[in-house]
Amino acid sequence: MSTSSSFPRTIVSYTVTTSLFIVIFLCSVFFFTRRTLEPSLSPYHTADIPLPAVDLPPPTPLLPQIEPHDGDVTVETNPKEVEDSRRGGDDVAVETELKLKDVEDSHTEKTEEEEEGRGESPGEVSVESVEHAVIEKMRGCDLYKGSWVKGDDEYPLYQPGSCPYVDDAFDCQRNGRRDSDYLNWRWKPDGCDLPRFNATDFLVKLRGKSLMLVGDSMNRNQFESMLCVLREGLSDKSRMYEVHGHNITKGRGYFVFKFEDYNCTVEFVRSHFLVREGVRANAQGNTNPTLSIDRIDKSHAKWKRADILVFNTGHWWVHGKTARGKNYYKEGDYIYPKFDATEAYRRSLKTWAKWIDQNVNPKKQLVFYRGYSSAHFRGGEWDSGGSCNGEVEPVKKGSIIDSYPLKMKIVQEAIKEMQVPVILLNVTKLTNFRKDGHPSIYGKTNTDGKKVSTRRQDCSHWCLPGVPDVWNHLIYASLLLQPHS
């Protein structure tokens, strides 16, 4: 009887226990299901899950900074988690996003610094970034008032005998000159320095352009120097050549050298006076030269296409018939029986200036006028026994240092009245010092196999390497000072 009564109680006990277990199980399922639907409250959720970028205020200084890592930062997101986190996990999301933003910003800054560090391609580094202070100091400095100094390694800009474009008449070392101090002088303006010459940077500035030198044999002297100094900036020197296949000779008056890697040209156009030379026939049928001082030189059509022009005239105005002025100077159809050479020079420069004003676009073209280059004849002139041999260093004192010919004052007057700006390469006084720089007896030693007499010395032109290299250095410095060089 007692056994049958205890059995129902056992069943009831098991039933209660089972029911309680089921209730606890269902509550647990409900509880954990809710936690799963709210990940921001889940104990399994961490701040390491990447979140999307959102618009947030800047981070406060109290937040930790994460060091940048190489490579791109990629953030993958789940749309469901994004929506849930916005509803329940704002604090954690903000901290995570700020850390990711710091990584991206640091990576961006590092990339920009690396790009700046790379600079331009090798061989085309502009000296403007390296010698900015030197260039700025040149502004307001008279580049043509100074002295010649030596002792550093900058000059010569190329070694004697290394440049195949030097005329025999200017190749003094090959022609037997043994002293070499004249090669090592550089020009130092008072109050500033010229930027160090950079041939490659010069070529970069000439990229796609034409540089043309127009004038007499003094400008050919400078033209050959220009070819030589620019050649030093080429890694492959075979990429420079005369487009017509011509060798440089005294008799030819037009050369075009192409620099393939920079798509630029350097040209020379011979024009002794910049105005038109002609001839007239006399009663006996003979012809005599004339100079039309009111008409521009026949070569002017070539000038128009150049981007940078360097003009000169001067030395031919002191020779024979030009200086005498008898039945030589012409205006219109009238030939003057006698005319003053200085006045003819003035009118010729006005003719040139007028042509520049009417034909040059200053927004696209740049014009230089290279001033008179000093000669140093002793005991005569070029055709009357004048000499300069034996000079081995620059003039240190004397009246010649401050000598300034009337021709240069006329040049300055003409330029001042022009509408198109012209840069005057006023090399007169700096060449006054350099009595040691001329070929003298070390000019061209033979012509057609015949030895040239040393009784006629060249004290007008310059040995190369030599003084004209400085003229081209001054052109380079002037280009650096241009607002859009």
UniProtKB/Swiss-Prot annotation:
Gene Ontology MF terms in the entry: O-acetyltransferase activity
Amino acid composition bias (Basic and acidic residues), ranges on this chain: 67-110
Membrane topology, from the record: Single-pass type II membrane protein
Location relative to the cell: Membrane
Assigned keywords, A-Z: Membrane, Signal-anchor, Transmembrane, Transmembrane helix
One GO cellular component, as annotated: membrane
Motif (DCXHWCLPGXXDXWN motif): 458-472
Transmembrane stretches, start-end: 11-31
Motif GDS motif positions after renumbering to this chain: 215-217
Region (Disordered): 65-127
Family label: Belongs to the PC-esterase family. TBL subfamily.
Note: Contains 2 motifs that are conserved in esterases, but it is unlikely that this protein belongs to the catalytically active pectin esterases.
PANTHER family xref list: PROTEIN TRICHOME BIREFRINGENCE-LIKE 5, PROTEIN TRICHOME BIREFRINGENCE-LIKE 9-RELATED
Functional summary from the UniProt entry: May act as a bridging protein that binds pectin and other cell wall polysaccharides. Probably involved in maintaining esterification of pectins. May be involved in the specific O-acetylation of cell wall polymers.
Protein name per the record: Protein trichome birefringence-like 5
Lineage: Eukaryota, Viridiplantae, Streptophyta, Embryophyta, Tracheophyta
Gene: TBL5
